[in-house]
């Protein structure tokens, strides 16, 4: 696997091309209360367990300041990342959870440049 592919989030595992995703979430009031009641709870371990159960590999898991509370990086397939989102949302632990796939921006903008050549503006 090339260095550029790895930098763009393309990972090869057991002969399959895997993607890299960032999940950015806001925890629920229920989880916030549970965390306050048991501040030593190992959220990393429980997050890793459910992530792996969805078929993903947990790369990182961080609590952050700001509009959102947690950011994690996972490797796998898109459907697996969506399954993880559904699982967390249905558990009531997360109020909001976004899934962002790492893309090859050079390829995206090359495709956009090619598509732009076919745009015909009205009156031209």
Where is each model-derived feature located?
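A compositional/biophysical signature of low hydrophobicity enriched in polar/charged and small residues
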Residues: 14-124
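Short, Lys/Arg-enriched N-terminal segments with co-localized hydrophobic residues
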Residues: 1-17
């Amino acid at each position: 696997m090339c260095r550029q592919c790895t930098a763009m989030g393309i990972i090869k595992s057991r002969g399959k091309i895997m993607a890299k995703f960032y999940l950015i979430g806001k925890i629920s009031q229920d989880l916030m209360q549970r965390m306050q009641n048991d501040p030593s709870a190992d959220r990393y371990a429980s997050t890793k367990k459910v992530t792996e159960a969805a078929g993903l590999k947990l790369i990182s898991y961080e609590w952050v300041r700001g509009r959102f509370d947690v950011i994690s990086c996972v490797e796998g397939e898109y459907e697996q990342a969506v399954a993880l989102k559904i699982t967390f949302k249905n558990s009531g632990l997360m109020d909001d959870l976004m899934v962002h796939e790492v893309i090859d921006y050079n390829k995206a903008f090359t495709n956009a440049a090619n598509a732009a050549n076919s745009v015909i503006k009205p009156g031209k």
